[in-house]
């Protein structure tokens, strides 16, 4: 809340459209449709929240675009058509964490501090919104989740968050 008046729960602000509709930038609701993915980020503000539902509700935060972070067509030829697509930060299942954390635990198996520590099935990740799954050069599954991703120059795996597969969604702005 950062010094602002206390606000309602995020769940209520998303679900109570009659009360909080002014905060809904775009959604699955009629009349609140989004622009095309290549124009979406132009109409968002860093900090806008994306709440989407597939099997359960998932909350993500808009952080900008690849171009905002200084990437170019030359640097990312596979992602060149998507440099202006929205990037979100979120936490949840992510295949990339399991092996990395297990490797760390294996390398420190003699350290009693890590005795009994199990690997995780996810963590904080950056994903891109709107890129068709089929356009990603890499695909995989972990548990019930399917992933498609691009390998970034620094080794990071930039996953696609597949918004078209959501049954409902809302881009939400705290202070419209």
Feature-to-residue mapping (PLM):
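Low-complexity, Gly/Ser/Thr/Pro-rich intrinsically disordered linker/tail segments
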Residues: 81-85, 89-176
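...with weaker cross-activation on analogous glycine-rich loops/strands in unrelated enzymes
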Residues: 4-111
């Amino acid at each position: 809340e950062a010094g602002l008046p206390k606000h309602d729960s995020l769940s209520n602000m998303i679900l109570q459209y009659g009360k909080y509709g002014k905060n809904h930038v775009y959604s699955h609701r009629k009349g609140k449709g989004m622009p095309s993915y290549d124009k979406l980020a132009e109409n968002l503000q860093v900090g806008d929240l994306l709440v989407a539902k597939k099997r359960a509700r998932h909350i993500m935060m808009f952080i900008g675009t690849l171009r905002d972070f200084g990437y170019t067509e030359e640097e990312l030829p596979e992602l060149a058509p998507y440099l202006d697509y929205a990037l979100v930060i979120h936490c949840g299942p992510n295949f990339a964490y399991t092996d990395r954390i297990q490797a760390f635990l294996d390398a420190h198996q003699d350290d009693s501090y890590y005795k009994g520590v199990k690997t995780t099935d996810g963590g904080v990740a950056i994903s891109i919104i709107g890129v068709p799954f089929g356009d990603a050069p890499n695909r995989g599954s972990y548990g019930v989740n399917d992933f498609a991703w691009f390998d970034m120059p620094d080794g990071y795996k930039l996953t696609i968050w597949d918004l078209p597969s959501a049954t409902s969604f809302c881009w939400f702005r705290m202070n419209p």
